[in-house]
Amino acid sequence: MAAKTPAQWKTLFENVPFHRENYYTGPLGPDYAPGGTCLRLWAPTAEAVTVTLYHKGDGGAVLGTKPLVRGAHGVWSIWLPGEQHGRYYTFAVTVNGITRETGDPYARAAGVNGVRSMIVDLARTAPSGWERDVRPTIPPAQRAVWEVSVRDFSQDAASGVRPAWRGKYMAFTQQGTTLHGDGIHPTCLNYLKRLGVKYVQLMPIFDFGSVDEAKPLLRQYNWGYDPTNFNVPEGSYSTDPTRGEVRIRECREMIAALHAAGIGVVMDVVYNHTYRTENPLNNTVPYYFFRQNADGSFSNGSGCGNEFASERPMARRYLIDSILYWAKEYHIDGFRFDLMGLYDAESINAVRAALDSLPGGRDILLYGEPWQGGASQLHRYEANKANLAMLNERVGIFCDDTRDAIKGGCFDAREPGYVEGKPGSFWDIGAAVAAWCRSDRLPPHAPSQIVSYVSAHDNFTLWDKLLCVRYEKPEFTARDTVALAQNRLAAGIYLTSFGLPFMQAGEEFARTKKGVGNSYRSSPALNRLDWNRAEQYHALVDYYRGLLALRAAFPRLGSTDRRAPEALQFFALEQPLVGWMLPAVWGDGAAWSALCVFYNPTDTTRTVSLPAGQWKLLSDGTSSSLWRGQSRVFTNKAPLAPYSATVFGAV
């Protein structure tokens, strides 16, 4: 039989009978038991499949090669008798007369650089007390996400983390770290507990291909948005990437330590593409898992060379299986989808439904980027902003409308936003406060669908953006009082808005990457969190800390009710001031019966009239913790400092 062309494979895989004949619902991957292990591989187009066994994850002698037997629905399998924990393996899959050696797409462990898969008894990788680890219960009003790379978190020698754990999973487990070990200024986990964020979003932690795990990491760096093995933790973050079980145990220890601190873990997942097309998915069933152009070439909506075909039944099943695996075996508390606009909405809703079926699964967060990285061949309803109405109300999106309204556009370094004085932007600030629930632009099902933010790993840090707007040639490491005030104002807006607050790690201490807007493979020194800045800008850190606590003390801001923003009462003020009042919900435990909030993006003090009653000053342009003490009470008019968010509580 003549070999199929890529275009012919595309035609076959878009054929309903193919899916009817080959869709499979049974177990896949390694099924370990002490008496033996069954390997199962879905490869319906394969002519032959063999497995080669190894004692080591890299190099070493071959222990043997055995054929797999084809069964129903294109599933190949083999039973390996005896104890197989720690045994490494690869498949050789023959399709179209071409044989490709590959790892197992369903592998749960792997050797160095993820080339060889490993059979693992997950029970042996459980850290002490893992069976008692539970997801922390975090009320909506307390939810705020802090995004960080495992590497960036502790790479700085000033972090106080022991050298062997810097840039590793284990850094999250070290208690009581302080700046240079001074015993005074907290860093890492110690710092997070004090700051008050309740979720840490980890940039990709599943096995990625851009860092050579076999080489020293001193000069290697990558964010990790180039996955290789979707169900295996990244090895460069472990203390020993050559032993497949170590990365699993240490990743779990990291998660358990965060949970013990009352912090949930959000996993940044990148199923939308792979590092190379020569990966376990494509080597097993060539062309099936990736979208194709009309000529059979790979579509490139990710901007990285390929894009995952989530709409195909077994691809969707793989996506759901992988998400559930991380949720169940790693106790993950949330998932952030990179380029979620490259998935069809039906698949994302199916992921949400699958998570909801787990015990406590309805509390697992799910949100993503509602855009693509290029032209896509996805011709179904994309999970993007335009189709927000088609997504489950507990699927959230990053709101670039909020981001750009507050600080200015991302693609022009000098374009200002509201906090830098952009004319007319106050209209969008009002919409952002209401999480766009009162706008026709992108009305969500619920305010909690909107992820409100001003900085993430992509594009400029907030500090760098503020300086780029202010100066043609900014000095990023110089202290700037106006930029600091604008930073506080930006935080004051999104942390007093409806929606899910999100921040890039270090935003709260004026993190700078010295004007580098895309540092995905820049030096470790540029990307690391500079813990000295947390001390140098401690007043800014305290401002974020106070706002997070203030928000938690007024639960209505975290409401998941679509109608909640309708209670906002906006004031008619002189432009560009924005002001609003929001009554509390009776019985929700709010510290005040109402909030009254004003934003002043100008360089002069303004005076505003307050609603009738007595209003305690809770937060102003420099301190967000006034509410903790005996602060001033206003009854008529009140001043607004330049570049400030000012918050009052009804007493």
Predicted features and spans:
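Glycan-recognition and catalytic regions of carbohydrate-active enzymes
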Residues: 21-26, 496-516, 528-595
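Substrate-binding/active-site clefts of carbohydrate-active enzymes
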Residues: 151-330, 339-359, 365, 377
